[in-house]
A protein has these predicted regions:
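Conserved hydrolase catalytic core segment
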Residues: 97-137
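Conserved donor sugar-nucleotide recognition element shared by glycan-biosynthetic enzymes
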Residues: 79-84, 107-108, 242
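Active-site loop/oxyanion-hole signature of alpha/beta-hydrolase fold enzymes
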Residues: 65-100
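Short beta-to-alpha linker loops that shape the active-site pocket of alpha/beta-hydrolase fold enzymes
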Residues: 62-66, 131, 263
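Conserved HGGG/HGGXW glycine-rich cap/lid loop of the alpha/beta-hydrolase fold
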Residues: 10-71, 76
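Catalytic active-site module of serine/aspartate enzymes centered on a nucleophile-bearing elbow/loop
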Residues: 253-290
Length: 290
């Protein structure tokens, strides 16, 4: 652990949004800064993981439309290329690249876009379980299933949409057209509200869910970048869409995913899925230090 540490919060102004980010700076560190990103998970979701890297400068942020980062039009969809521009600007303003990146879920998809557009920003990328439906062998039904989640949210609100999301993300194995056509479950099954608050700007279930999961990465640009990219898949989430996304992306890059302890959110203590934050962080460190 380095002897000096300072923490700052700042904002970047981008077309259509103001994006908030945090830097815990450790000037004496011998390591590159580590950026922890998700989508729609913001900075608060990485507090537990960040504690394991007290020898590095840590950069976290809230993606536009989530937590502290407001969009001018909350109903608009935001795709990975726009998130990549935001990430690039944050990296520049936080001191410049290259940085190491741990990216979770939709953040891993945004990180692939960052590597493609700004190849010198990232030294090592650990991309954990990108739910990239467009890259799956069953892309057609997978994309249809994501569209069904969004349709449920649009029609019935957050509780119904979240219940449908849980049903889909818990499913193991290839998806089918028949599964995509199934209605979502009763929200009460998952303790979700049955009422509709009328809001349709949720950063997970709103229009961005389609822009993120159906994204088509520039694979040639990703492969050409100097970034060392490691895909991660959870030992407890085998067969689930995001886990399968890690395998599909790794195949595109000519590699195999590294298995991580726990499930999709294995870096956080959870009562909902298997997790082992200490072992998870150790795996991230092993990759970054290799």
């Amino acid at each position: 652990m380095t002897e000096t540490m300072s923490q700052t919060t700042d904002t970047i102004t981008m077309p259509g949004a103001k994006v908030v980010y945090d830097v815990v700076e450790r000037p004496g560190s011998a390591h590159l800064p580590l950026m922890l990103i998700g989508q729609p998970m913001g900075a608060s979701g990485f507090a537990e993981l960040a504690k394991h890297f007290d020898d590095r400068t840590i950069i976290t942020y809230d993606p536009r439309g989530a937590e502290r980062s407001a969009k001018d039009d909350p109903m608009s969809a935001t795709g990975p290329d726009t998130h990549a521009d935001d990430l690039h600007k944050v990296i520049q303003q936080a001191g410049g690249g290259p940085v190491d990146v741990f990216a979770s879920s939709g953040g891993a998809i945004n990180a692939l876009a960052l590597v493609a557009k700004y190849p010198n920003d990232v030294h090592t990328l650990v991309a954990h379980e990108p739910p990239l439906a467009s890259a799956l062998p069953d892309a057609g039904p997978a994309v249809a299933t994501v569209k069904a989640i969004h349709a449920t949210y649009e029609q019935s609100g957050w509780g119904a949409g979240m219940a449908h999301f849980i049903m889909v993300t818990s499913q193991r194995g290839p998806l089918t057209a028949e599964f995509a056509a199934q209605p979502g479950p009763d929200p009460q099954m998952f303790g979700m509200p049955t009422g509709d608050d009328g809001k349709r700007s949720d950063p997970l279930l709103g229009p961005s869910i389609l822009a993120i999961t159906t994204y088509q990465p520039d694979w040639d640009a990703v492969r050409a970048a100097p970034t060392h990219i490691v895909l991660g898949a959870g030992e407890a989430s085998d067969g689930q869409m995001a886990n399968r996304g890690a395998h599909a992306v790794a195949q595109q890059l000519g590699s195999e995913p590294v298995m991580f302890p726990g499930g999709h959110g294995g870096f956080n203590t959870s009562e909902w899925e298997p997790s082992d934050p200490d072992a998870f962080a150790a795996k991230v460190r092993d990759i970054l230090d290799a």
